[in-house]
Amino acid sequence: MPTPSAPSPQPKGFRRAVSEQDAKQAEAVTSPRFIGRRQSLIEDARKEREAAAAAAAAAVASSEPGNPLEAVVFEERDGNAVLNLLFSLRGTKPSSLSRAVKVFETFEAKIHHLETRPAQRPLAGSPHLEYFVRFEVPSGDLAALLSSVRRVSDDVRSAREDKVPWFPRKVSELDKCHHLVTKFDPDLDLDHPGFSDQVYRQRRKLIAEIAFQYKHGEPIPHVEYTAEEIATWKEVYVTLKGLYATHACREHLEGFQLLERYCGYREDSIPQLEDVSRFLKERTGFQLRPVAGLLSARDFLASLAFRVFQCTQYIRHASSPMHSPEPDCCHELLGHVPMLADRTFAQFSQDIGLASLGASDEEIEKLSTVYWFTVEFGLCKQNGELKAYGAGLLSSYGELLHSLSEEPEVRAFDPDTAAVQPYQDQTYQPVYFVSESFNDAKDKLRNYASRIQRPFSVKFDPYTLAIDVLDSPHTIQRSLEGVQDELHTLAHALSAIS
């Protein structure tokens, strides 16, 4: 597919780049309203992690001595209490452990599991280890057993069993992934451009209802956009398209040309999600699904695992065409969709989603940060020059100029570094990560994902649109059989053409 043969710009200062635009564009780029940015997946993921950590800390703090059963978490099962207990030994003598174990023997507790772990709260002069025991004891003996353990051990507390967070196993279960972040809802946020516009707020509710009612397998309902909405789209479309030839990566340019040819991408009409979804399905297997706003990080990333991109249908307020505090269809259709039409980038996006399934809150926050610095704000090298591939850049006139100017710092993409890099959500990014190629980024991401601690691996089955959980020799063997069938087909094809 040929790409526009426009000369690539040399990096220049951001202010110089802005000064070369017309007055209206320059004002939009530098105005405070434009510089503010939508809430990110990272912020949502961090809030989820901090809330979970606070709940766990509160549970630990409330399990100090007093009432032996106060704040103890256990499961009732046929008259028995089943629980997890953590404790540290009192002193360093070998007999310390035997005294603790003797307590469980005295009460005839059935021990299911016993292990040592690094102590979360090591005590001075004590081994930096603690003991985890899962046991079962008659419910009537539980209080006495806990009191006895506390007499011979330190830092005794119950612990919830580490459970893998729920995640969808089949694509239809994405109907359950609808947790929205409401901070930038025009009904709730005083700073939202549409807060004082009752007509706009009512329009948003009408379009949001489409997403709330949508179920997997249904065609995405069409939206009849108003003249004002189309005018807003036109201003964004024309302004950004003028930069793509010199600032966007070749994959975005090729995808954008195809969308103009086959999906009705043009300045005087907003594409319908159903038409775009059908096009993507044929190109890379990705599908669109309507969403009413900004999804929680875990739900959004889980959707990517199924090659489903959650996409808004509403458009930003007419008073702020160059900026939206939340994702809207300009951001999705102009930034994300052309990139999802590329097979390698589509696989990269799905890999991030697969890595998120069953991951801890801490890992979700890190993956969201990797997503932020790649899929949203990533740069790549092409023909020795920097180009933009992140949707946050390709749908933001000001940041697209800024990212390829001399002002920001550019670092080589490394998932371990990007995962903990502080991000900027109030102005333009001071740091961007550049990938040598999408294949290189994909390989680095897979290496990073392989080190995420989960008691299983996952594999997407493209025939059933389901997630295979590889947690036993049997499930792995079954998956290998499918790979062997594919290899046989490829080997036959090679022999046929050689």
From Swiss-Prot:
Q: Which domain of life is it from?
A: Eukaryota
Q: Which UniProt keywords apply?
A: Catecholamine biosynthesis, Cell projection, Cytoplasm, Cytoplasmic vesicle, Iron, Metal-binding, Monooxygenase, Neurotransmitter biosynthesis, Nucleus, Oxidoreductase, Phosphoprotein, Synapse
Is the ATP-binding keyword given for this protein?
no
Q: What is the effect of changing residue 323 to Y?
A: Does not affect Vmax for phenylalaninet. Increases KM for phenylalanine
The record's region (Disordered) falls at 1-31
Write down the required cofactor(s).
Fe(2+)
Q: How is its activity regulated?
A: Inhibited in feedback fashion by the catecholamine neurotransmitters, especially by dopamine in competition with tetrahydrobiopterin. Phosphorylation of several Ser/Thr residues in the N-terminus regulates the catalytic activity. Ser-31 and Ser-40 are readily phosphorylated to activate the catalytic activity. A cysteine modification induced by N-ethylmaleimide (NEM), inhibits tyrosine 3-monooxygenase activity through the modification of the Cys-177.
For the site Important for substrate specificity, which positions are given? Answer: 425
- Which stretches are tagged as biased composition: Pro residues? 1-10
Outcome of substituting residue 372 to F: Does not affect substrate specificity
Protein modification: Phosphorylated on Ser-19, Ser-31 and Ser-40 by several protein kinases with different site specificities. Phosphorylation at Ser-31 and Ser-40 leads to an increase of TH activity. Phosphorylation at Ser-40 activates the enzyme and also counteracts the feedback inhibition of TH by catecholamines. Phosphorylation of Ser-19 and Ser-31 triggers the proteasomal degradation of TH through the ubiquitin-proteasome pathway. Phosphorylation at Ser-31 facilitates transport of TH from the soma to the nerve terminals via the microtubule network.
Do the record's keywords include Nucleus?
yes
Task: Give the binding site residues for Fe cation.
Answer: 331, 336, 376
Where found in the cell?
A: Cytoplasm, Perinuclear region; Nucleus; Cell projection, Axon; Cytoplasm
Biological process per Gene Ontology, one example term: phthalate metabolic process
EC class: oxidoreductase
Question: Where are the Phosphoserine modifications?
Answer: 19, 31, 40, 472
**The EC number(s) this enzyme carries:** 1.14.16.2
Q: In which pathway does it act?
A: Catecholamine biosynthesis; dopamine biosynthesis; dopamine from L-tyrosine: step 1/2
A GO molecular function for this record?
A: oxygen binding
Q: Name one GO cellular component term.
A: nucleus
Q: What does this protein do?
A: Catalyzes the conversion of L-tyrosine to L-dihydroxyphenylalanine (L-Dopa), the rate-limiting step in the biosynthesis of catecholamines, dopamine, noradrenaline, and adrenaline. Uses tetrahydrobiopterin and molecular oxygen to convert tyrosine to L-Dopa. In addition to tyrosine, is able to catalyze the hydroxylation of phenylalanine and tryptophan but with lower specificity. Positively regulates the regression of retinal hyaloid vessels during postnatal development.
Q: How does it assemble?
A: Homotetramer. Interacts (when phosphorylated at Ser-19) with YWHAG; one YWHAG dimer binds to one TH tetramer and this interaction may influence the phosphorylation and dephosphorylation of other sites. Interacts with NT5DC2; the interaction results in reduced phosphorylation and decreased catalytic activity of TH.
User: Which protein family is named in the record?
Assistant: Belongs to the biopterin-dependent aromatic amino acid hydroxylase family.
List the PANTHER family hit by this protein, alphabetically: AROMATIC AMINO ACID HYDROXYLASE, TYROSINE 3-MONOOXYGENASE
Entry protein name: Tyrosine 3-monooxygenase
Species the sequence originates in: Rattus norvegicus
Q: Which gene encodes it?
A: Th
